[in-house]
């Protein structure tokens, strides 16, 4: 790779950049988890509950909600990657 950053592959990240990237990824994962918990809780858990444990309906609802959330997240991620690749191939940034 040249000193101007052209040619030969991707530039190497410094340790600080790797730490920042890991922190950003952790923030994204934490945010996604919190949204998943909030959305599925609102959808599946009755606000006037009287039991300490989840009942069968709540448990099934939460299971389906989490599965749909992850499936949707994967589909959106794949579509975003395809869009990014097509923009890069067309020379748009």
UniProtKB/Swiss-Prot annotation:
Query: Which GO BP terms sit in this record?
Result: protein insertion into mitochondrial inner membrane
Query: Disulfide pairs?
Result: 40-65, 44-61
Question: Residues annotated as region Interaction with transmembrane regions of transmembrane proteins in transit?
Answer: 1-31
Required for heterohexamerization: annotated span? 73-93
Q: Where in the cell is it found?
A: Mitochondrion inner membrane; Mitochondrion intermembrane space
- Briefly, what is this protein's role? Mitochondrial intermembrane chaperone that participates in the import and insertion of multi-pass transmembrane proteins into the mitochondrial inner membrane. Also required for the transfer of beta-barrel precursors from the TOM complex to the sorting and assembly machinery (SAM complex) of the outer membrane. Acts as a chaperone-like protein that protects the hydrophobic precursors from aggregation and guide them through the mitochondrial intermembrane space. Compared to TIM9, it may function as a substrate sensor.
Under which name does UniProt file this protein? Mitochondrial import inner membrane translocase subunit TIM10
Q: What is the lineage of its organism?
A: Eukaryota, Fungi, Dikarya, Ascomycota, Saccharomycotina
The gene it comes from is TIM10
